[in-house]
């Protein structure tokens, strides 16, 4: 459960980072973008311990959050961040 909470917090943090339009950040992606696919994968692997209804709700929330994040990444001018979108989408 803690992994899920951390993942949701990381996604929210990445949304904030992607909305910031600082010129010095244009060519850098946030380090959390690198670990997000592995984190999503570990959430899926550890989810077998959760009750089925809780799991469905959790996955649904994660899917919504990741979809929002990918949309914001695609709208950003940060090309490095945009390159991470397929990895993040595939991890979910």
Curated annotation (Swiss-Prot):
Keyword flag Coiled coil: yes
Record keywords: Coiled coil
Coiled coil: 53-82
Protein name: Protein OP-ORF
Source organism (scientific name): Rice dwarf virus (isolate Fujian) (RDV)
